[in-house]
Curated annotation (Swiss-Prot):
Protein name listed in UniProt: Cytochrome f
This protein's UniProt keywords: Electron transport, Heme, Iron, Membrane, Metal-binding, Photosynthesis, Signal, Thylakoid, Transmembrane, Transmembrane helix, Transport
Similarity comment: family membership: Belongs to the cytochrome f family.
Entry note: cofactor: Binds 1 heme group covalently.
Amino acid sequence: MRNPDTLGLWTKTMVALRRFTVLAIATVSVFLITDLGLPQAASAYPFWAQETAPLTPREATGRIVCANCHLAQKAAEVEIPQAVLPDTVFEAVVKIPYDLDSQQVLGDGSKGGLNVGAVLMLPEGFKIAPPDRLSEGLKEKVGGTYFQPYREDMENVVIVGPLPGEQYQEIVFPVLSPDPAKDKSINYGKFAVHLGANRGRGQIYPTGLLSNNNAFKAPNAGTISEVNALEAGGYQLILTTADGTETVDIPAGPELIVSAGQTVEAGEFLTNNPNVGGFGQKDTEVVLQNPTRIKFLVLFLAGIMLSQILLVLKKKQIEKVQAAELNF
């Protein structure tokens, strides 16, 4: 006849096995998280950024240089997978939302639709996928969108635009991930992705001059003695100040909100603000996942599940033996 303490021994064994299982899972989880968390080793014309910042569109402060010309802040979004495998094509979806009913001031002062543009900074080694790697479905999403590298030697930084905003509030970038097995300079890990996207014309040209998509101010305090409408559009204001008279030219586009005889302070607005566009920036991350690690993780989890099943079967076997002993 067996010792009746068998049940107590079995209980202690089960507790020990469960503790080991929990510890093993926690260890693997911490390993994965820490390893993946740190990497190893004046219109919507994005190419104007190349003139002002030929080396990189991202300043040391983290700001995309498009913000130097597009002064208004607007929303921008980028959607990418949380993790991708090496040598895989995936979608980076850029969203540039705005009110489709809005009209911007064009260069000649007339109103028109907004254009959109974007610059997408991918991790080193990532690039726009070649056409022969795109599926039929992805080709349809991309359409005729033309993607251009920021520099010839910088395939991971891509610019697009200007594009008609009515059709391209959502732009699909087909991205090809690198393969560390083929390129030893690339490592697995988590990497940053930066987006800069604008809609509408900017307020400042790369030369530093103001565009007509601005609110214009009085340069000095004084009285507006004359308001002359120009034949080509816009206005010429004669401002009488304490030092004499001064001419203020207002280009075609902004609406005048002052009149002759009105006294203004220095810096007071003379026109409305016609700008309906703006720039948005978004930062996110993508993980270049090691497929071998995934295989080992699957095997590890399968082993845990198998051990749990065997433990349950063993428990039932012991319970049957104990029941037989009690009946004996």
